[in-house]
A protein has these predicted regions:
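Substrate-binding strand-loop-helix patch
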Residues: 184-195
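N-terminal Rossmann-like NAD(P)+-binding domain of SDR-like oxidoreductases, especially those catalyzing
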Residues: 1-183
């Protein structure tokens, strides 16, 4: 059984669809926030549901609601958690920094804590290429992070990596972070450069 957070987002919906042959049960959660078109998010969910049928269950939940999160874990007994939930968008973080701290840091902390409590075997979480900051040595690799993010969004993602590392060390959780660069394709986010 797999939990996918941020399942109505571009990467989240595609991830759910790609899990069709791997898992018999996929639970997806998302806040359906209004950062960009909720209609687009619902269309993605409809596409996921059409592809996966009864294998997929959607729940509208915010990671900041730890009580609801715990109930989902109690009910579902997950083997793997794929965390793709986040307040996205580098530019938007300048206008609404509080949303980034609440969702990307506090929400991720709640998810980690619940994963620890329920002894989740594997956690895969989205990070971002923005954690590299102004790094000029190419090609980039995971060992080149200088901990000098130049935007708040990047700082929240770097914070997630640090919390994940601490939880991995303290509680023997297996956590992998994926530092996505610009991800694009059909059903992509309308605020991305390619769609403007």
């Amino acid at each position: 059984k797999i939990l996918v957070t941020g399942c109505a987002g571009f990467i989240g919906a595609e991830t759910c669809c790609s899990l069709e042959k791997i898992s018999s049960k996929i639970v997806g959660i998302d806040t359906l926030n209004k950062y960009y078109s909720v209609k687009l998010k619902k269309l993605r969910l409809k596409r996921v549901k059409n592809k996966l049928g009864k294998k997929f269950k959607f729940l509208q939940v915010n990671l900041n609601n730890k009580k609801k999160l715990r109930k989902i874990f109690l009910k579902s007994k997950f083997d793997v958690v794929i965390n793709l939930a986040a307040q996205a968008g580098v530019r938007y973080s300048l206008k609404n920094p509080k949303s980034y701290v609440e969702n990307n840091i506090n929400g991720f902390f709640n998810l980690l804590d619940v994963c620890k409590e329920f002894k989740i075997k594997q956690i895969i979480s989205a990070s971002s290429s923005s954690v590299y900051g102004e790094e000029k040595n190419f090609p980039l690799n995971e060992n080149i992070c200088k901990n000098k993010p130049i935007q708040l969004y990047a700082a929240t993602k770097l914070s997630n990596e640090a919390m994940g590392y601490a939880y991995s060390s303290l509680y023997n959780l297996r956590i992998v972070f994926l530092r996505f660069f610009t991800v694009y394709g059909p059903w992509g986010r309308p605020d991305m450069f390619l769609f403007k």
